[in-house]
Amino acid sequence: MSALDVIIMAAGKGTRMKSRIPKVLQRLAGRPLLGHVLDQARGLQARRAVVVTGHGAAEVEPFIARAADGLDVRCVRQEPQLGTGHAVQQAVPALQGDGTVIVLSGDVPLTRTDTLRALVAAGGGGQLALLTVTLPDPAGYGRIVRGSDGAVRGIVEHKDATEAQRAIDEVYSGIMAVPAGLLAGWLARLTNDNAQGEYYLTDIVAMAVADGVPVVAHRIADALQVAGVNSPLQLAELERAHQLAQARALMEQGVRLADPARFDLRDDARTGVRGELACGQDVEIDVNCIFSGRVELGEGVRIGAHCCIANARIAAGAVVHPYTHIDGEQPAGVQVGEGALVGPFARLRPGAQLGREVHIGNFVEVKNSSLAEGAKANHLAYLGDATVGERVNYGAGSITANYDGANKHRTVIEADVHVGSNCVLVAPVTIGAGGTVGGGSTITKSTPAGALSVARGKQVTKENWQRPAKLPKA
């Protein structure tokens, strides 16, 4: 492939989104639309990407700087916005001036890299190549006008099209590959003599024909690849179509999804970590589960309904029961050991590390804590900044008090400890191996191995106790 530069159109206001967030920063699968398009440029190994900004540039340009990730990206402003041709005019001075220029739309997120490579190849370096698609309802799109010989003669925008032209179902996707050496000359000849009073980039097609430059249309069948976003409804429809495509790809690998229409795989919106789900054999995922960031499910893992799992590695044979939240952060993420049972209604926060056959039950929260093989916290408990040994049984209603108002402190619970119900372990504290903490105790000092520790008020019982009577209402 010859030298390739990319222009990304990202100046539009997106009025129909009815949002103060610029359209190109609206999220699809957890990633801004423009982030998907920058990925396309990166996948093409573009020499340079020039992003044309305008509306919301103060928000869009910092995002571009964060998302560049090794790509040579330049931003140019289009002020005022006078059409697509005018936008490309602003970008030309930032190009290298040779090779091929491919024009992408910042709100068309799902074009495949191999499709774009095929478009560039169709242009052959010296031709103008258009990416087109046939739509059952082409309203709003520019129509591809062909001559009697089938050759492309031009593109007519929907608002300027005649009734006969509006009947054409082959449309221009907004993506083209242009010989860099010809682009500036064509742009200089653009006029705004049209219904919109704008400078249309599509007018260069007729100029190419007039100049004897071949125009080729690379037509694809998959309309999803060139679908743009102009409204919340379109964004939601594209999200569902994209998620269904991801679900089908997983099922083709052998993953068992209870309902592929109720599955989501997203980027981690907090950190930008790309959504990736790797599954071993015989993995089962129930309905309405959301995966974000990097998640790995080992062989035979079962995920119950309505779980949210981010940045986690779940080892073979583990079961995550319904309504569980696993909220890891890279690089380490949350670790769940082989054969572990988690949930329902459990929460594993960053730094949670569960060993083999650990049980974390309903309404148990674990943060920045490790639990060794066979440890159990089955009911209504909190473990924060704790190291829990093998075979520990941690009772219902018990918590580690890890924060003194300024600093966090660790609790160590050694192997074979039994912690009764409704206990408070005030860190820093160590419960020695084989020890027992009596129910209802507040432990503030470390205890030796094998000891029974009880720290609670003495019970007082008053027989024949009379409860206070309610006062009469005034």
Curated annotation (Swiss-Prot):
UniProt-annotated binding residues for Mg(2+): D107, N230
Q: Where does UDP-N-acetyl-alpha-D-glucosamine bind?
A: K23, Q78, G83, T84, S105, G106, D107, G142, E157, N230, R349, K367, Y382, N393
What this protein needs as a cofactor is: Mg(2+)
Location comes to: Cytoplasm
Q: Which UniProt keywords apply?
A: Acyltransferase, Cell shape, Cell wall biogenesis/degradation, Cytoplasm, Magnesium, Metal-binding, Multifunctional enzyme, Nucleotidyltransferase, Peptidoglycan synthesis, Repeat, Transferase
Region annotation (Pyrophosphorylase) maps to 1-232
Family (UniProt) = In the N-terminal section; belongs to the N-acetylglucosamine-1-phosphate uridyltransferase family. In the C-terminal section; belongs to the transferase hexapeptide repeat family.
The name under which this protein is listed is Bifunctional protein GlmU
> Which reaction does this enzyme catalyse, per its entry?
alpha-D-glucosamine 1-phosphate + acetyl-CoA = N-acetyl-alpha-D-glucosamine 1-phosphate + CoA + H(+); N-acetyl-alpha-D-glucosamine 1-phosphate + UTP + H(+) = UDP-N-acetyl-alpha-D-glucosamine + diphosphate
